[in-house]
Amino acid sequence: KDSSAWENIPVPNAEIAEGFDRIPMWVADMNFQTAPSVCEAITKRLEHQVFGYFNPSEDYYNSIINWQKVRNGVEGLTKEAIGYENGVLGGVVAALQAFSAPGEAILVHSPTYTGFTSVLNNNGRRAVHTELKRDAEGIWRMDYEDMEAKIRKYHIHAAIMCSPHNPTG
């Protein structure tokens, strides 16, 4: 057992109002069992017994190419046009390098996942914060007027948006 979602929900002795339930909404913890094909692939990979960095396989690229073709009607996509990242922050860095230059202002919600602000600082970008507003029901909402004003004022060309439903990641 190693899943908080499965082991700790429901929380013992917690009072829940009638008609409500608890739904865990973490970023990476799964709320469902893993598909047998995934377990089989992991078991097969374990037989190799050497774990380190790897290059994506042809199956990796082909699955993306096929997905884009079937789902979005994209024709002519090649593996050379597909990037590969091991994590979210690496992908954010790649996007920042592609769409902004050092010294430029990047719009970011506040509060936000601290990894995003660290990536901006470590890559020479300036974070311009736009505050999320908490409404009367306690729900975080984007302040579109503030966002537009800051985009104009700071000549912003790129933004990092974290889910307003989970603003700190």
Q: Model-predicted segments: where are they?
A:
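N-terminal small-domain helix-loop-helix segment of the aminotransferase-like
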Residues: 1-87, 94
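Conserved core of the PLP fold type I
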Residues: 51-169
